[in-house]
Amino acid sequence: MTRIVFMGTPDFSVPVLRTLIEDGYEVVGVVTQPDRPKGRKKIMTPPPVKAEAERHGIPVLQPEKVRLEEEIEKVLSLKPDLIVTAAFGQILPKQLLDGPKYGCINVHASLLPELRGGAPIHYSILQGKKKTGVTIMYMVEKLDAGDMISKIEVEIDETDNVGTLHDKLSIAGAKLLSETVPNVISGNIKPIKQDESKATYAPNIKREQERIDWAKPGEEIYNQIRGLNPWPVAYTTLNGQNMKVWASEKVAAKTEAAPGTVIRTEQNGIVVASGNSTALLITELQPAGKKRMKGEDFVRGKNVQPGDVLGEANEEN
């Protein structure tokens, strides 16, 4: 039986690990990130992959840095025939890449060489793409640059956000892995080199990318809002206070109002002017210190009036 070490951390990785177990491989160990403090109370919380591994009685390693010699030895002592990674969050050192006889393969949530890096799902929506997918490739020491083994395309719906697209890609990635691993083991594959000239990158989201610039066209802001939902969430300001914007809808009507101006309130939210004479309807938001709410509840509370301007004054945390 093929001995596999799985490396992954967030929810995306869980169906991938589960597939390996269900397909009957001997998952001899799981490597994931350390437990981290979570929420307002900073409660130490295990990564989703750790919880899944423990449910199946699989040994778990949680190195802060997998590149350290002692951590490499721990992984190799498990004698893996194959290492499979999915959203692990660390680049593997050469000793690990060279260890297993079938190599190391990675399940990456984009159609490589596009969107290499840690936030491919976010960027596929932020950039307004109509499709993305999952690529399984051999791992090398360079970020997401190894030879590609298999791919699957996934359509991005107009209403998808990072959460819904994440779930689609996670399921697609698990299915693709189930089809790919037997071919990797048998050698029945023809890996394809990535075209470096077509490589693009999806680095982790920075704080400045979360702030809405109302001078941008409505389509771009619409993609920003859904491309940051459910994490880290786009924000603007109202009366000097930060306000998270969870969801919006495009508005067909043109406007000559200055970007950021509240044009009108509607039953299900507020219509805000954006760049190029466009506008957006904010349908779900979260004022500072309050719970997430529907736009209709915000309007009912008379929290905003036509003529108010979003995006001015305080733009810090």
Swiss-Prot record:
Which reactions is this enzyme annotated as catalysing? L-methionyl-tRNA(fMet) + (6R)-10-formyltetrahydrofolate = N-formyl-L-methionyl-tRNA(fMet) + (6S)-5,6,7,8-tetrahydrofolate + H(+)
Give GO cellular component annotations, separated by semicolons: cytosol
Region of interest (Disordered), residue spans: 292-317
Q: Which PROSITE patterns match?
A: GART (PS00373)
Q: Name one Pfam family in it.
A: Formyl_trans_C
E.C. designation(s): 2.1.2.9
Keyword Kinase listed: no
Function (record text) = Attaches a formyl group to the free amino group of methionyl-tRNA(fMet). The formyl group appears to play a dual role in the initiator identity of N-formylmethionyl-tRNA by promoting its recognition by IF2 and preventing the misappropriation of this tRNA by the elongation apparatus.
**Family classification:** Belongs to the Fmt family.
Q: Under what name is this protein listed?
A: Methionyl-tRNA formyltransferase
Q: Which organism encodes this protein?
A: Bacillus velezensis (strain DSM 23117 / BGSC 10A6 / LMG 26770 / FZB42)
